[in-house]
Amino acid sequence: MSEFLPFSRPALGDAELAAVGDVLRSGWITTGPKCAQLEQAFCQLTGNRHAIAVSSATGGMHVTLMALGLGPGDEVITPSLTWVSTLNMICLLGAEPIMIDVDRDTLMVTPALIEAAITPRTRAIVPVHYAGAPADIDAIRALGERYGIPVIEDAAHAAGTAYKGRHVGAAGTAIFSFHAIKNMTCAEGGMVVTDDDALAQRIRSLKFHGLAVDAFDRTMQGRAPQAEVITPGYKYNLADINAAIALVQLEKLTQHNARRAALAQRYLHGLADTPFLPLVPPAWEHHHAWHLFIIRVDERWCGIDRDGLMQALKECGIGTGLHFRAAHTQRYYRERFPDMVLPATEWNSVRMCSLPLFPSMNDDDVERVITALRAIAKV
């Protein structure tokens, strides 16, 4: 049997090892100069005035929503078809998640679905840039401006994604992930970008205990200003060990995303005459980062359901992923919102399957997956 082909594998090499070694030898391994360099480099990528490195996108979402002043009685609009961390953070702040449906084929929230969910208690809108493609952010931001509601972009899938010629997050506020399977990784980490000066200052404080300065600031500036708590905060700072890896990954991002795109095109060509349905690219101008390659598996057409397909591929030595099981179908949210019905989300949630996609895959790996899928579907 062939070697197991995982759903994802981080693209790490000698440059990342050397970067970590440099940090270890420097004597400064926590938040420091590498983190500052990463923030500057990310500002150059997205064009934002501020980039705040955090220990995870989840932590970044937490302190960003907290910096907006979210609390009991407030509502946040976001899709159910997302990773549960966003919903969890909303609930942990005492606010109410208002989960909405998505377009059935792009899996993006739409301005119409968002507007229908707005109430006098809406305090934030969190659209998701899904699988490497961007949501229609101009239209969504226009809604936010019309109603006076901040838009916080979930860009966890969108490092390298462009919308109408500009990187996702440009001129707004967005949160990126550097988790192990993302297009750029440092094992765990994330970045908040924003052009809002006051919001950036609050996020910087909240991600480090609520202090006005961190340990590196105090080393560079001495004891003035004093490390004084402005408001109770958390510890979501990113260590220089992680930042050093992320800096190397950022340098490789364009090359890695180009390889992802080439692999995705091979999938699209090889599966074009099969019953497996890929996602439909958004109609607006964009550059796809191809974080995920997703197919939808309908038993009526494929002769097998999604779970059966994933098991059959596993028996062929091929790994798969699920992005995502709808949040409102999970026990806590199902019990909290028992009457919630989101037809397009639910249809996709039980049919979607993420195929292997990572830069070090070769063309034969893709052909192996396509051959297995065609054999399973008997086409």
Swiss-Prot record:
What GO MF annotations does this protein's record show?
pyridoxal phosphate binding; UDP-4-amino-4-deoxy-L-arabinose aminotransferase
Which of the residues bear the PTM N6-(pyridoxal phosphate)lysine? Answer: 182
Q: Which cofactor does it need?
A: pyridoxal 5'-phosphate
> Which CDD domains does the UniProt entry name for this protein?
AHBA_syn
- Keywords in UniProt for this one? Aminotransferase, Antibiotic resistance, Lipid A biosynthesis, Lipid biosynthesis, Lipid metabolism, Lipopolysaccharide biosynthesis, Pyridoxal phosphate, Transferase
User: What reaction(s) does this enzyme catalyze?
Assistant: UDP-4-amino-4-deoxy-beta-L-arabinose + 2-oxoglutarate = UDP-beta-L-threo-pentopyranos-4-ulose + L-glutamate
| Domain of life according to the entry | Bacteria
The record's annotation in InterPro entries points to: ArnB_NH2Trfase, DegT/StrS_aminotransferase, PyrdxlP-dep_Trfase, PyrdxlP-dep_Trfase_major, PyrdxlP-dep_Trfase_small
Instruction: Give the record's GO biological process terms.
Output: lipid A biosynthetic process; lipopolysaccharide biosynthetic process; response to antibiotic
Which pathway does it take part in? Nucleotide-sugar biosynthesis; UDP-4-deoxy-4-formamido-beta-L-arabinose biosynthesis; UDP-4-deoxy-4-formamido-beta-L-arabinose from UDP-alpha-D-glucuronate: step 2/3; Bacterial outer membrane biogenesis; lipopolysaccharide biosynthesis
Q: What are the EC numbers?
A: 2.6.1.87
What HAMAP family does this protein map onto?
Answer: ArnB_transfer (MF_01167)
Instruction: Name the PANTHER family on file.
Output: TRANSAMINASE, UDP-4-AMINO-4-DEOXY-L-ARABINOSE--OXOGLUTARATE AMINOTRANSFERASE
Its annotated function is as follows: Catalyzes the conversion of UDP-4-keto-arabinose (UDP-Ara4O) to UDP-4-amino-4-deoxy-L-arabinose (UDP-L-Ara4N). The modified arabinose is attached to lipid A and is required for resistance to polymyxin and cationic antimicrobial peptides.
Q: How does it assemble?
A: Homodimer.
Give the protein's recorded name.
UDP-4-amino-4-deoxy-L-arabinose--oxoglutarate aminotransferase
Q: Which gene is the coding source of this polypeptide chain?
A: arnB
